[in-house]
Every structure is written in C-alpha cells, then in structure tokens.
Amino acid sequence: MINLFTKDWEINNIETILFDKDGTFIDLHYFWGQMTELRVKEIIKRFNKNNEIFEQLCLCLGYNPKTGKMLSDGITALYSRSKIIDIFKYDLKKYDIYTTDIELEEIFDYVSDIFYKNMQTYTKPIPEAIEFIKKVRALGIKIGIVTSDAKKSTDLTIKHFRWENLFDVVIGRESSTETKESGIPTKMALRELNANPKTTVMIGDAPMDFISAKNAGIEKTILVATGQIDENKLKETSQYTVKSLSSIVIN
C-alpha cells in the first residue's frame, strides 16, 4: 500500500489506481483538437458544405481552432461519446446537415482509424503524469485505465509509447454498453484487477471521472487540472484536486 499527499490533503492505504486517459496522462487539447478538426473536415466533405463553417462546427464540438484549446464548457469536456453525437446531430441541423447517430458513429470511427495510423503526429503524453504512473507502478500498485475513448485506440497508444508494463487493464468505450458515468466500466476494471474500491483511487481531469468512481463505490477521486477544466472549478467536485500530478508526494 502507498499514501498520497499534498499540502492540502492526504489519502492513505492505496492498493489500486484507475486513470482516465485524455487530459490526465495524454495532452487533451492537442489530441482532441486534432481529432475534432479531422471529424469536421470529413463532415464538410461528405455533406458537400463550404469550408466557411469549419470554425463553427469545431466550436459545436467544444474546440476553438484559433486558440488550439478545448472549451471547458464544451460537449467533449462534459459528456461521453454517445451523448456528444446526440447533441452534435442537432447542432448540425443549423447548417442544413441532417444525419443520424449511426452515420455520425461511422464518421467518427472512420476518422479514428485515420487518426491512429498517424498516432505519433497527434498524440502527446503529459510528462509529469507518466512520471507519476511510473513511480506508483514501481511501488507495486495495480493500475488500470477507464476511458470513454475506444479500447482499441487506447491499446494502440500504449503500444506506441511502449507502456505495456505500466497498465494491467484497459476499459474503453466498447468494453460496455453503459456510459462511463454509470460506473459500470469502472466496476469492470475493479473486477478485472480483483481490486477493493475502498483501497482504490480514481485519477481524472473532469467531473465525469468523479461520478464514474462514486457510482462504482470508490470514495476518493483526485482531479488534475491538466485537461479542460481549471483547478478552482474542479474543487467544486472533489477536495482532492491538484494542478499537476507532480505536486503529489508518494510514500
């Protein structure tokens, strides 16, 4: 077991840590910014629309192409993929684009295939997060990933960066028909790790991660402000909040 603490809080007797991916140990702004641009370009192409709506469609998906940042109140920050598609489908009607959830799923999957063939171009780790993961791993902690991104995509990321020895289990979007917020995917990770929720901590960058952990019986979630939401806002959800995982002391 290990203990984690900062000048503001302490969590003791940890055996297992579950991590969110994007915004937690992968640079979310760059990753999802590039993904959003590819999705929007494909939609403009398929529906034969003018490129003048490119910026507006990016903003609908919660990304500002002018700043290169994801919006803290954008749908990508707040919801899982199925909800994002449902909202985006209705936003597209404003631009005379009429589609279905199934068609948008197909477009998103098509773009993901292209995206992950060029992973080295689009994916950047958060160095201090990877260092933290390596430290707790060296102390014998069981580590899992629970993400609303695809398991296939996450596995490719792990393979690309040669992180196979860092993670014991990956639960992704296709691992369950239930959303991440339901807590079911998190329960799956706990079960596969044979982990006790009482000695498990979730680490993520958004309220979604807190909700997911709570619904799985995990009492403590550390929220890190390396994603779309600043630390003060995250403190409204969890008392265990940091600007960076590098500020956490491990013993």
Spans of model-derived segments:
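Conserved G/P- and acidic residue-centered "switch" motifs that form tight phosphate/ATP-binding loops
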Residues: T24, T147, D205
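Substrate-recognition element of Asp-dependent hydrolases with the DxDx(T/V) motif
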Residues: I17-F19, E106-V111, Q120, A129-I158, ...
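Short, structured helix-loop boundary elements
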Residues: D101-E105, I126, I130, E164, ...
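Asp-based, Mg2+/Mn2+-dependent phosphohydrolase catalytic module
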Residues: M1-I17, Y30, K134, K151-N251
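N-terminal helical cap/lid subdomain that shapes the substrate entry/recognition surface
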Residues: I11-P127, L139
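Surface-exposed, interaction-prone regions with an acidic/low-complexity signature
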Residues: F54-Y63, E131, L139, I145, ...
